[in-house]
Amino acid sequence: MSFFHNVMNKLGRYRLIPDRTTGSDYMHRYYIFLKDRNWFPFNVTLHKIVRSDDPIMHDHPWGFMTIIIKGGYWEHTPCINPHTKEIVGENKVWRGPGSIIMRTSTEYHWLELDDNKPTTTLFFMGPQKRDWGFLLNNKWVHNETYLKNAKTN
């Protein structure tokens, strides 16, 4: 492990986030600013993403901005029919080093690593606005409901 990892781990500012359906490593999160931020409106973390998302759209509990530092990923976002507001496909855009991405808490996406190569990002999250979930058949499904069903299938 790196010196940075060891220091952050000793300070209690590191968290390994497992894939919520398989339990395998998904992301290494380092709390650069605050670990517990109930009283503060934003936070800054360093993410090392080591696994692609499952290929299903999800949103986040907060708006965010991320800057790709190393590596990159394909970001899949919904392609929406402007007349019916229904999702009719996906946009797939490469996000490489230097890319800056901003999203509200209600915007959907999923991330696909390129050849399973890790990606490092600086991640700025705003205040929590809502619970997060997944988009199934053009309907929002709470993350706990989706993940419970995903584990049993």
Regions found by a protein language model. Name each.
Residues 60-75:
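Short, conserved beta-strand element in jelly-roll/cupin
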